Amino acid sequence: MIIWINGAFGSGKTQTAFELHRRLNPSYVYDPEKMGFALRSMVPQEIAKDDFQSYPLWRAFNYSLLASLTDTYRGILIVPMTIVHPEYFNEIIGRLRQEGRIVHHFTLMASKETLLKRLRTRAEGKNSWAAKQIDRCVEGLSSPIFEDHIQTDNLSIQDVAENIAARAELPLDPDTRGSLRRFADRLMVKLNHIRIK
């Protein structure tokens, strides 16, 4: 089973993925960006694409590895990744579903103001690459193809994770961490996922 968490940059995908991972056993957070970074490092600058999702190889690789993992891993794969192009969505998620694999897809929605505020907490201002993608992402992700939509403006990470688990009918382990431990865990996730563009 796959839980795909989509959303604009700053919507809380990665934090939600790791919150679910801590409370779903067994589970694994699968990061499609890693293949994108690998492609970016191996392609000559003169022919490199601005968005690694534009490489058919990126989409084919992630589809293939997710298909293989779904067939061999008995836990839940949690995939935090923004996909805005319907054709890319269909090449990966649509194809996995067509072949009978269970993919629960959720899009975390938030206002532009909320997204900018969240991006600032990770040192990305209004002129950052992520901030410049907000309008494109919010518009594209509002399409019905990207349902199930979850409005997150007034939800905590814990609320969003519990909402996703309920919609996917997955029981979560209780969160026995104190507030300090929860804060430290989320800070570590944030620090481990800072991307320098």
Curated annotation (Swiss-Prot):
Question: What membrane topology does this protein have?
Answer: Peripheral membrane protein
- Fetch the Pfam families from UniProt: AAA_33 (PF13671)
Identify the keywords attached in UniProt to this record, alphabetized: Antibiotic resistance, ATP-binding, Cell membrane, Membrane, Nucleotide-binding
> Where located?
Cell membrane
Binding-site residues for ATP, renumbered to this chain: G7, A8, F9, G10, S11, G12, K13, T14
Primary location group: membrane
GO terms (BP aspect): response to antibiotic
Going by the entry's taxonomy, the superkingdom of the source organism is recorded as Bacteria
* Xref: Gene3D superfamilies: P-loop containing nucleotide triphosphate hydrolases
Q: Which InterPro entries match?
A: P-loop_NTPase (IPR027417)
Q: Record's GO cellular component, any one?
A: plasma membrane
Q: Does the keyword Hydrolase apply?
A: no
Q: Which residues cross the membrane?
A: none
Alphabetically, the GO molecular function entries are: ATP binding
Q: What does this protein do?
A: Involved in the resistance to tunicamycin. Binds ATP.
- Name by which UniProt lists this protein: Tunicamycin resistance protein
Species name for this entry?
Answer: Bacillus subtilis (strain 168)
